[in-house]
Amino acid sequence: MLIIAGLGNPGGKYAGNRHNIGFMAVDAIHRRHSFSPWSKKFRAEIAEGELGGEKVLLIKPQTFMNLSGEAVGEAMRFYKLQPADLVAIYDELDLPAGKARLKTGGGHGGHNGIKSLDAHCGKEYRRLRLGIGHPGIKEMVQNHVLGDFAKADKAWLEPLLDTLADNADMLVRNEDSQLMNKIALALGGKAEEEKPRKDNKTTEKKPAGQSHIHQARNHNQPKVLTTGPMADILKKMFGNKGE
């Protein structure tokens, strides 16, 4: 079983905030796939369904952002799950708008929702960070995060959420790099280059049944001198062996 937790603040007042992009992502997955209607449990809104043949619980904590870990931790204990069974989706100031990054573990980066998850759920869970951009000035961060997305943001926000929802089964299959490439391409970026495969270098095959030493002895042996001054000296020293 996998828990996909979208982080945000509850209530209509915060629904369109940049800080609520985690809620938006989970809502998009819920709409795209066959999940149960939202219900209330664990101080959260939850919905059950399947992705990629595995049972999945979508969860939106209703505790407000700073206490998100209390709700998610309660659900994890109920289902006896480990940090590896959790994916958290949340906003990231330090990523340009529309960029996404997915990794296991790491720091909280000053995100209070992640601080709470770390405290209540452990740290080795997967973190899907969705970039909302930085306003450029520290004093503007709070208004930026708790401000609504602008109309112009729809140009990247909608394809980001749609692509994530369309390929949510990749989260279950741990196809993290493939999912990141899908999102990058949908936003007009470039997929990350795959690591080059090692060339299958052709090596000289050794004859069957022969050791490396035996091969070396039979390979390009120097010619024995039979004539000339050096040959005469060798004959005087060692005699005519082998003749």
From Swiss-Prot:
Basic and acidic residues bias locations: 190-207
CDD domains named among the record's database cross-references: PTH (cd00462)
Highest taxon of the lineage: Bacteria
Location of this chain's protein in the cell: Cytoplasm
Catalytic activity: an N-acyl-L-alpha-aminoacyl-tRNA + H2O = an N-acyl-L-amino acid + a tRNA + H(+)
Pfam families in the cross-refs: Pept_tRNA_hydro
Catalytic EC class: hydrolase
GO biological process, one term: rescue of stalled ribosome
Keywords: Cytoplasm, Hydrolase, RNA-binding, tRNA-binding
Residues of the active site: H19 (proton acceptor)
Annotated site location: Discriminates between blocked and unblocked aminoacyl-tRNA: N9
EC numbers: 3.1.1.29
Binding site residues for tRNA: Y14, F64, N66, N112
GO molecular function: peptidyl-tRNA hydrolase activity; tRNA binding
Region (Disordered), start-end ranges: 188-243
NCBIfam families referenced in this protein's UniProt entry, alphabetically: pth
Functional description taken from the UniProt entry: Hydrolyzes ribosome-free peptidyl-tRNAs (with 1 or more amino acids incorporated), which drop off the ribosome during protein synthesis, or as a result of ribosome stalling.
Quaternary context: Monomer.
Family designation: Belongs to the PTH family.
Protein name (database record): Peptidyl-tRNA hydrolase
This protein's encoding gene: pth
